[in-house]
């Protein structure tokens, strides 16, 4: 556990910065991102928002790519992704 007095304010640990609210970080950055999701059936790549609020289907084979949750969208098992 890191005490508040032991933190270097100019170079805070990455794990502490990641847990902070997006506006209270040393450099403000959003928690959301766009990602390329590869379909497991036809290998078609679809761009999906990480916090998508709707079900995303593949454009070619109509396979379910991700389902919404309360926060980040849950990818279907077998789908691979990369951040944009």
Swiss-Prot record:
Gene3D superfamilies: Zn-binding ribosomal proteins. GO terms for biological process: translation. GO terms for molecular function: mRNA binding; structural constituent of ribosome; zinc ion binding. Binds 1 zinc ion per subunit. A zinc finger (C4-type) spans 39-61. The keyword Ribosomal protein applies. GO terms for cellular component: cytosolic ribosome; cytosolic small ribosomal subunit; nucleolus; plasmodesma. Keywords: Host-virus interaction, Metal-binding, Ribonucleoprotein, Ribosomal protein, Zinc, Zinc-finger. It holds the Pfam family Ribosomal_S27e. Its cofactor is Zn(2+). (Microbial infection) May interact with Tomato yellow leaf curl virus (TYLCV) and papaya leaf curl China virus (PaLcuCNV) C2 proteins. This interaction prevents activation of Jasmonate signaling, thereby facilitating viral uptake by insects vectors. Belongs to the eukaryotic ribosomal protein eS27 family. This is Small ribosomal subunit protein eS27z. It comes from Arabidopsis thaliana (Mouse-ear cress).
């Amino acid at each position: 556990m890191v005490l508040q007095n032991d933190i270097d304010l100019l170079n805070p640990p990455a794990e502490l910065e990641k847990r902070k609210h997006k506006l209270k970080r040393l450099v403000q950055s959003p928690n959301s991102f766009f990602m390329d999701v590869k379909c497991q059936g036809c290998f078609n790549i679809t761009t999906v928002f990480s916090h998508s609020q709707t079900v995303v289907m593949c454009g070619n084979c109509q396979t379910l790519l991700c389902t919404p949750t309360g926060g980040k969208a849950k990818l279907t098992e077998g789908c691979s992704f990369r951040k944009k």
